[in-house]
């Protein structure tokens, strides 16, 4: 469970335990004065964790989404980046007080900040152009060690959801480090599978199911990334630096050591999307058909809405859950090795 915070709003009088925090900060609670957020103030940060956030964590909040609306720098300490420091402060507090590994969801705070938060890339516009940019954005972030971007799959800002676009966005998200959806509040912006017609509902459910099934592989590669510093999602030139195609196919990426992905980021024409995929040396199995293809070639083929370009390196071993897995929390389900 996570809750969204807007820390820059400070601590207002209507918040639970405001009185205790106001006293800590030398503010008369009767004034109902909002206590401003100051990252560099140790007294403020300690009181906030003790009086405001700590009780909610005891009630079941696992981690915080810091939807920060701040200025760039702290008002009292020169050149202290608000984003960088709040990520550090929250992560360090969890590290000290909890027995579990810290988890934080927030924006990029600059070089070195990859140590702390899972990334929130901001309120994406609902458009094919936004979708087309994200695979490149996702993979190249590994160049600054930032392997955990997450996106508002399907877009956030707009008037309504395009079912095809949303489906393609989810397919990309299922083979990204973090898979989540989010949007503005609106009657035409709901993203639950059942709000779409049966065709799209079935495809969306199958896409989510694929993510569940691949969880053991994703976790294995995430752990390897933690140990080695090589991101789960990375550009092709990491593995094939001598090939010019590794730089030319900007949206193509490796998802772990053995899975090659080329997201579909444009609408279909006559029920199919035409996609060009570069297959590096070796042999590759096409996920949806099982066809074995030789590498060192560019493949162009049509993909229906329920298909997208995923290729598995021949000889790879992929640990996966069985197709009936329903819960990834504390899971001790059987694992199939493919």
Question: What kind of region is each of these model predictions?
Answer:
Residues 1-314:
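Catalytic-domain carbohydrate-binding cleft regions of carbohydrate-active enzymes
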Residues 307-338:
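Accessory, solvent-exposed terminal regions and/or long lumenal/extracellular loops of proteins
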